A protein has these predicted regions:
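Thiotemplate assembly-line natural product biosynthesis machinery
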Residues: 1-17, 68-75
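Phosphopantetheine carrier-protein modules
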Residues: 10-29, 48-54
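Catalytic nucleophile serine of serine hydrolases
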Residues: 32
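Conserved catalytic core of two-component sensor histidine kinases
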Residues: 36
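C-terminal structural segments of small proteins and small subunits
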Residues: 52-74
Length: 75
């Protein structure tokens, strides 16, 4: 799942280096607009709804965290 999420994010957001950081939000690499875009892309690609409760820094700080969230939400 991680590889699929990473490939998708690299395609959609080539200006962001998702591979080098494990603190994308904490380091200021992702802002609220970027997170909104990621939510839209993941929702469409994986057919999931990301509830408000899941929109927390920990779920967006790394590709691993994003992939874990997608897997959780897919059931």
């Amino acid at each position: 799942m991680k590889e699929k999420v990473l490939a998708l994010l690299k395609d959609e957001f080539p200006e962001i280096d998702f591979e080098s950081s494990c603190a994308l939000v904490d380091d200021g690499i992702l802002d609220s607009l970027s997170i909104t875009g990621i939510i839209a892309v993941l929702s469409m690609e994986f057919g999931i709804i990301i509830p408000y409760e899941e929109i927390v820094e920990d779920n967006f700080n790394s590709v691993d965290a994003l992939a874990d969230m997608v897997e959780r939400l897919r059931g």
